[in-house]
């Protein structure tokens, strides 16, 4: 994906590069620092084509646990976002020493909504990616089981998108 076609967040300001963002840049992985969250966790935006490379680098930096993967919709006509929250886990690590970082991939709603699956790096991403696909329609390339998780297989649409129109269920109510 070319830089000018990359979706950017409409509600997240660009910030001075954080430590992890600087490390990714030194390793030749393009990224954009976003403002830290309310508890100081570094947020970084990466292009969909660089996600797998960025996550592999994070794993090498010691971020060995995918705590959470999810999605959200910035609003009708705006971006869909896939986010990944990574932490360091060590048997002898004190809780206050845990490092955390969050990667975000911004996808234009009207463009290709495909990004690499992280299943080969983090097996725990399996159901999390399936839920994000099921609710937002973000496709995870090379996912081992790319099926809906919560909705029936024949369901149309993506229920957590803000522009989703709920189907009329009167015919189902009359059946009972």
From Swiss-Prot:
Q: Where are the transmembrane segments?
A: none
Q: Name one GO cellular component term.
A: plasma membrane-derived thylakoid membrane
Q: Which residues form a coiled coil?
A: none
- Which residues lie in Polar residues bias regions? 1-12, 20-30
Disulphide bridges, residue numbers = none
Q: What is the annotated localization of this protein?
A: Cellular thylakoid membrane
Please list the GO terms describing molecular function. Answer: NADH dehydrogenase (ubiquinone) activity; quinone binding
Q: Which EC numbers does the record give? A: 7.1.1.-
Return the PROSITE patterns for the record. COMPLEX1_30K
**Which region ranges are annotated with the description Disordered?**
1-30
One Pfam family for this entry, by name?
A: Complex1_30kDa
The superkingdom of the source organism is Bacteria
One Gene Ontology BP term is: photosynthesis, light reaction
Topology relative to the membrane, per the entry? Answer: Peripheral membrane protein
Q: Which keywords fit this entry according to its UniProt record?
A: Membrane, NAD, NADP, Plastoquinone, Quinone, Thylakoid, Translocase, Transport
> Can you tell me which family this protein belongs to?
Belongs to the complex I 30 kDa subunit family.
State the protein's purpose.
NDH-1 shuttles electrons from an unknown electron donor, via FMN and iron-sulfur (Fe-S) centers, to quinones in the respiratory and/or the photosynthetic chain. The immediate electron acceptor for the enzyme in this species is believed to be plastoquinone. Couples the redox reaction to proton translocation, and thus conserves the redox energy in a proton gradient. Cyanobacterial NDH-1 also plays a role in inorganic carbon-concentration.
Designated name of the protein = NAD(P)H-quinone oxidoreductase subunit J
Q: Which organism is it from?
A: Prochlorococcus marinus (strain AS9601)
